[in-house]
């Protein structure tokens, strides 16, 4: 294996300038988690994040990063359009800057493989979901060999959580407990791209959480394609409930969330663990997809309406203040008016605090894409509008019912787009609702990561407002200290690129 230290194209060999990078993320929380790893890998190899690299005043230096990485999603058709649209915008930029590199990873890369380079020959690197850790090597190999590198593996090379990371938040963190999925939903391409479920050992998960808390993290979200089948690899069907309870013993960890469970394998033990463990938050994301038993069967979702509503009842009985969110697909092939009415019925009964609603999008390679009776676009659109109107009403009513409640809000950074104009700060309630709150006159603003006690004065359609400052209080936290320390940290200096191995090429899969 050879090792080289690269300099930007055209640079004097005696001057080693650090190359800048930018990661653009599309899709789910798993991709956000993986993007933090991609950033960590690049910084470990000597790259500097583009928005921190700076540009001297009056400088004619390029305003584009040296490396752009797309971490892609393949769940919906517009994901393809978004990627190739972005790549098209970069083509003339790269023509002006031959030393620039473009890499494409994630689920769409795993799916399209060499097709990406055929459609966009200015792309330098294509890597998949199973070899995230190979990015620096592939970038260097592409520069060294002056040709695109396409490397897609069929099984997981390294569990992403073991890779270097650059976390976006000093007070909240994603922790992956598993990757892949053993379900075979007919509309979903993710299992084909992420592979079969692979679980981390509980001790490894807890050790990562303890290390994060030691750095100041106050909240973690446990990640998996189906968190409540966690343990299938090591033969423990109750492993997820045990893991939740174990997080309750980690001193300094105040908030635990998880996403995403599957109704078919959601057990009473998990509900009990949520109710019994104080730092597990009263919020639950439970994907419905459809309220029709006939459609659920066609989707190959191994539960029916009665089981789903039974789970909702069980959660509400044990955790009365729980906010439950969901995913719903409208217009699945063969969905009739009666099927859709069943979905509306479940939404009325379940009273979700919010819902991610999607118009069905056929994905090549999935069984649903070749099913007959694809629903006309105008019918799907009409149903979608009826569903969103119903859910918007329920969300608004539910938010209005929060008026008068006193909540502990984890102060967040960047959650409130109008905070400067409204002179409010923003954060998340225990049930994960967004809260915009006012400060008493002359009060010192809490830091992101601190916890503010506020009283809700208004439930808006998509958030809560807390303008009554009479009971306002702030608890300064180690998470806030961590945020403050990060702000005070000097901008990273350009130390130049570090040696990166070219690696041993694997069989090219295009």
UniProtKB/Swiss-Prot annotation:
It catalyses: N(6)-dimethylallyladenosine(37) in tRNA + (sulfur carrier)-SH + AH2 + 2 S-adenosyl-L-methionine = 2-methylsulfanyl-N(6)-dimethylallyladenosine(37) in tRNA + (sulfur carrier)-H + 5'-deoxyadenosine + L-methionine + A + S-adenosyl-L-homocysteine + 2 H(+). Residues 19-144 form the MTTase N-terminal domain. One of its GO terms (molecular function) is 4 iron, 4 sulfur cluster binding. InterPro entries: Elp3/MiaA/NifB-like_rSAM, Methylthiotransferase, Methylthiotransferase_CS, Methylthiotransferase_N, Methylthiotransferase_N_sf, MiaB_methiolase, rSAM, rSAM_horseshoe. [4Fe-4S] cluster 2 binds at residues 181, 185, 188. Belongs to the methylthiotransferase family. MiaB subfamily. This is tRNA-2-methylthio-N(6)-dimethylallyladenosine synthase.
């Amino acid at each position: 294996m050879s090792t080289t230290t690269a300099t930007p194209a055209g640079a004097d060999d005696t001057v080693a300038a650090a190359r800048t990078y930018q990661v653009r993320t599309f899709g789910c929380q798993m991709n956000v988690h993986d993007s933090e790893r991609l950033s960590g890998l690049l910084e470990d190899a000597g790259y500097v994040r583009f928005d921190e690299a700076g540009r001297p005043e009056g400088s004619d230096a390029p305003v584009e990063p040296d490396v752009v990485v797309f971490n892609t999603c393949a769940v919906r058709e517009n994901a393809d359009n978004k990627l190739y649209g972005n790549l098209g915008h970069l083509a003339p930029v790269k023509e002006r800057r031959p030393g620039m590199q473009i890499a494409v990873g994630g689920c769409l890369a795993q799916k399209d493989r060499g097709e990406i380079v055929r459609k966009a020959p200015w792309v330098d690197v294509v890597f998949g979901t199973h070899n995230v850790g190979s990015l620096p090597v592939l970038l260097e190999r592409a520069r060294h060999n002056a040709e695109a590198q396409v490397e897609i593996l069929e099984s997981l090379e390294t569990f992403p959580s073991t890779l270097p990371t650059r976390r976006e938040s000093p007070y909240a963190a994603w922790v992956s407990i598993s990757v892949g999925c053993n379900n075979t939903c007919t509309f979903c391409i993710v299992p084909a791209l992420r592979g079969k479920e692979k679980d981390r050992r509980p001790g490894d998960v807890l050790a990562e959480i303890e290390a994060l808390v030691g750095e100041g993290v106050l909240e973690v979200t446990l990640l998996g394609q189906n968190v409540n089948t966690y343990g299938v690899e090591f033969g423990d069907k109750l492993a997820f409930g045990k893991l939740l309870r174990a997080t309750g013993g980690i001193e300094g960890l105040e908030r635990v969330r998880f996403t995403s469970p599957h109704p078919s394998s959601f057990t009473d033990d998990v509900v009990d663990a949520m109710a019994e463990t104080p730092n597990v938050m009263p919020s639950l994301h439970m994907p419905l997809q459809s309220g029709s038993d006939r459609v659920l069967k066609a989707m190959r979702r191994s539960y029916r309406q009665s089981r789903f509503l039974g789970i909702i009842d069980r959660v509400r009985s044990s955790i009365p203040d729980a906010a439950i969110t969901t995913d719903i697909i409208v217009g699945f092939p063969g969905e009739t008016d009666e099927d859709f009415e069943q979905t509306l019925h479940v939404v009325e009964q379940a009273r979700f605090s919010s819902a991610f609603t999607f118009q069905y999008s056929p994905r090549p390679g999935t069984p649903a894409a070749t099913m007959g009776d694809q629903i006309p676009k105008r019918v799907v659109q009409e149903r979608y509008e009826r569903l969103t109107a119903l859910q918007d009403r329920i969300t608004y009513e539910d938010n209005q019912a929060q008026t008068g409640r006193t909540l502990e809000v984890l102060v967040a950074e960047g959650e409130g787009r109008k905070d400067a104009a409204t002179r409010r700060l923003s954060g998340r309630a225990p049930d994960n609702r967004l809260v915009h709150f006012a400060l008493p006159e002359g009060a010192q603003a809490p830091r992101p990561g601190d916890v503010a006690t506020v009283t809700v004065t208004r439930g808006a359609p998509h958030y809560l407002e807390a303008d009554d400052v009479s009971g306002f209080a702030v608890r300064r936290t180690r998470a806030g200290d961590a945020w403050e320390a990060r702000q005070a940290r000097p901008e990273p200096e350009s130390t130049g690129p570090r040696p990166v191995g070219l690696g041993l090429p694997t069989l090219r899969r295009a």
